[in-house]
Amino acid sequence: AVNSEVGVITSNADNARLTSFGADGNPIYVAVNYNKPADCITGGDTHAAADIICYMNGYSDPRREKYFTQSEWPGQTYVGFRRGIVIPPLASVGRKYSGVNISISSPVTWMNAAEVAFLKAEAKGVFGFNMGSGEAKDFYDEGIRLSFEEWGVSGADTYLANTTGKPQLYADPANSNSYAQELSDITIAWDEGATPAQMQERIITQKWIANWQLGNEAWADYRRTGYPRLMPATEDGNKSLGVVDSELGARRMPY
């Protein structure tokens, strides 16, 4: 594809998006607000996941204000809802977690230039494929810069130079579902001395962050690579009767 005369998506102007909907509007917005009770102001029973907020908080990621609503927990601007738990009462507890920052008219992205850049980075850095001119680091950095541009935030240079930031530990402000283990020790800045596995984790983690709201793509990458590293479902939160592994999560959808 990269050698085709047609080429691939390389700029945000060419992103594949849906911008016109029916009367209900953006379908992700509809899903987020499904079963929205009057006393749950951040949207039904859907909230931003603790995993991605732990990564982005640890990385001091400026895209947070574009992705999430601020939480109602004192002293915690962004705090996510852990997946695979027994849902607490929405009116008194659940409503306090960060929600999804989306409107009824927000466009739905199907594929973006950032994803293409990360695909090139993985192909070159992990598998050694010929991606034309450019090294894995070039494509990786480009993916992050394109994502920052897509979401209208500055600070990509500072973000790319961060060699120490790591995902924060998850301390549930409700004191119910904290996770004491480190999610990952992967940092942001590219490391030419990294192993292929470390390169892949770094690329997929940033691709996952950049592909916010592209859930099918994130799920496909997670099943394919095991990245990003996520929190397991809690023992009482896994209601699959042993069908779904709490560590791995769902691998397929039954028909």
Language-model regions: role of each:
Residues A1-G155, G193-E201, Q206:
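Structured, solvent-exposed acidic/aromatic patches
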Residues F148-Y255:
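C-terminal functional modules
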